[in-house]
Amino acid sequence: MTDPSRLVTPERRGDDLGDAALRPQNLSEFVGQQQARANLQVFIDAARKRKEALDHVLFVGPPGLGKTTLAQIVARELGVGFRATSGPVIAKAGDLAALLTNLEERDVLFIDEIHRLSPSVEEVLYPAMEDFQLDLIIGEGPAARSVKIDLSKFTLVGATTRAGLLTNPLRDRFGIPIRLNFYTIEELESIVTRGARVLGTPITADGANEIARRARGTPRIAGRLLRRVRDFASAADAEAIDRSIADHALGALEVDSAGLDAMDRRYLTTIALNYGGGPVGVETMAAALSEPRDAIEDIIEPYLIQCGYLQRTPRGRLLTDHAFRHLGLAAPSRDPAQFGLFGDTGDQE
């Protein structure tokens, strides 16, 4: 099974609790997402000048890119209260009502994984977002009655990694949709350098670059790798984290020069050696790796596709020549028709 403790997983792990100290506290400290950051600053400044609640905000993007951090920054920049929860935690309408009725004027309510809200909870959320009212049914049967409760004007900040799972009525109620993208190596270098400074760990420019190159475009992974490399530097009594220390530490942790770990390499090697580079169906790969299909599609494949190691074609998964070079293997000669005309249209399997 896919190990949730993978060092390069973008999902939150238990040891990421230490990331709180590394998080930027305001938009000026936040690195990357330049356009999103600039737009947010405009919307926040305008709401503050008008003394109004900010329009509801939806952050969309892969895990680990700073959606929660930005939500906290929004509240801090507005100078208002911040309450955080997640979609799966709000089990029934009463749970949501309790959260909403305790909000003060212009407060920020952050709902992570908002795509996982149940339909019954969503129905209660619609009038709350649009009219700042709760429509609740009190009692059951003939004695049931509808009650309207006025709410303080608040800002809902939602975060999702799966925008396609949001219902249209919910998505349309967010006035400020913002998509977050993967970070460049230069941006991650700045994040690693700042993180090392916060941790009180000297780091050289090439040491920060080495960590950034292997962080898969994701600040959460960069912070995690930095903490582990710092352990190796401390154990070796190194004066600073330089490229050689970072390279040794990350090699020992099985994170290679492209940021791939043992699971990624196993996936690529299986297609290369067992299936001639593909095409091979995702169900076949799930059986070969003893992994659920969802884990392959949502956890393993996205970064490999982003790096240009893998293509999803109408006939299945296909390794690129770039992947064979990374594995140190000779690429087979293939019919160009294997790549398909329209890219990722799903498996035949």
From Swiss-Prot:
SMART domains linked to this entry: AAA
Any one of the GO BP annotations: DNA recombination
Residue sites binding DNA per the record: 293, 312, 317
Keyword Magnesium among UniProt keywords: no
Subunit structure comment from the entry: Homohexamer. Forms an RuvA(8)-RuvB(12)-Holliday junction (HJ) complex. HJ DNA is sandwiched between 2 RuvA tetramers; dsDNA enters through RuvA and exits via RuvB. An RuvB hexamer assembles on each DNA strand where it exits the tetramer. Each RuvB hexamer is contacted by two RuvA subunits (via domain III) on 2 adjacent RuvB subunits; this complex drives branch migration. In the full resolvosome a probable DNA-RuvA(4)-RuvB(12)-RuvC(2) complex forms which resolves the HJ.
Domain notes: Has 3 domains, the large (RuvB-L) and small ATPase (RuvB-S) domains and the C-terminal head (RuvB-H) domain. The head domain binds DNA, while the ATPase domains jointly bind ATP, ADP or are empty depending on the state of the subunit in the translocation cycle. During a single DNA translocation step the structure of each domain remains the same, but their relative positions change.
Name the UniProt record assigns to this protein: Holliday junction branch migration complex subunit RuvB
Organism: Rhodopseudomonas palustris (strain TIE-1)
Recorded name of the encoding gene: ruvB
